[in-house]
């Protein structure tokens, strides 16, 4: 009997906006607005659309939106989970990225499950909650093989944001480390990628090892 391979991805999104630590209500809650579930805590608001592939459609701090909306691009907006490598999983399966997910709330955890799909052979589960200890958003993605074939894939977290400065601690030297991103540079153990609004007129990629398990924008 074939074992069901499972891939787990833990993501911690911390809001770095000044002023988020406030005297407002210090209890997290989950509210449903049509097919969108809104997780909120203090000055944070985090919205996930069950009807749009379990996509993260909004992340706000002090009412300031950090993710791009469908007004920027009708298809590629917000934040989502993809399968990789792109050479084998493109375009993304609709059941993973676009079709409705089944939603349930377990205490203070929002759980979304994609329907088992015979074409992709996978089912994706997404869990979202808020850590009241440090105001971070806890995201847990898992992929289940529902086919009878071996699956080789890796998780790919995709986040679309407005222009700004992205940075992360660089890891070890690797032959895969390469970039054609305009303006990116390495300094003091960090990779810095300035991306002003309106300046990216072509597709660009930066491939790099990382250290510390975080990236900030």
Show the residue positions of the predicted features.
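Acidic-aromatic substrate-binding/catalytic surfaces of carbohydrate-active enzymes
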Residues: 36-98
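Extended, loop-rich substrate-binding clefts of extracytoplasmic carbohydrate-active enzymes
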Residues: 24-28, 85-136, 148, 152-153, ...
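Bacterial Sec-dependent signal peptides at the C-terminal "C-region" and cleavage site
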Residues: 12, 16-29
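Short N-terminal segments immediately surrounding and downstream of signal-peptide cleavage
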Residues: 24-40
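A contiguous, surface-exposed recognition patch within enzymatic or periplasmic domains that forms
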Residues: 44-46, 51-58, 64-65, 135, ...
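Generic recognition of long tandem-repeat/solenoid scaffolds
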Residues: 37-40, 59, 108-115, 207
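Hydrophobic beta-strand positions in extracellular immunoglobulin-like domains
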Residues: 142-143
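Bacterial N-terminal signal peptides that target proteins for export
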Residues: 1-8
């Amino acid at each position: 009997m074939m074992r069901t391979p499972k891939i787990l991805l833990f993501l911690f999104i911390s809001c770095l906006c000044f002023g988020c630590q406030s005297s407002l209500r210090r209890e997290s809650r989950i509210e449903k607005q049509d097919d969108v579930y809104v997780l909120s805590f203090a000055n944070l608001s985090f919205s996930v659309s069950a009807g749009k592939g379990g996509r993260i459609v909004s992340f706000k701090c002090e009412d300031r939106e950090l993710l791009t909306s469908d007004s920027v691009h009708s298809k590629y907006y917000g934040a989502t989970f993809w399968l990789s490598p792109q050479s084998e999983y493109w375009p993304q399966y609709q059941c993973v990225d676009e079709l409705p997910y089944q939603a349930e709330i377990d205490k203070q955890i929002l759980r979304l499950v994609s329907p088992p799909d015979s074409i992709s052979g996978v089912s994706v589960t997404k869990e979202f909650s808020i850590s009241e200890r440090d105001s971070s958003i806890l995201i847990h993605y898992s992929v289940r093989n529902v086919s009878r074939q071996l699956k080789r894939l890796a998780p790919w977290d995709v986040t679309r944001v407005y222009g700004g400065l992205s940075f992360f601690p660089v890891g070890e030297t690797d032959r895969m480390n390469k970039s054609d991103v305009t303006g990116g540079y390495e300094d003091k153990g960090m990779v810095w990628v300035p991306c002003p609004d309106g300046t990216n007129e072509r597709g660009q990629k930066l491939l790099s090892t990382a250290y510390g398990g975080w990236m900030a924008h």
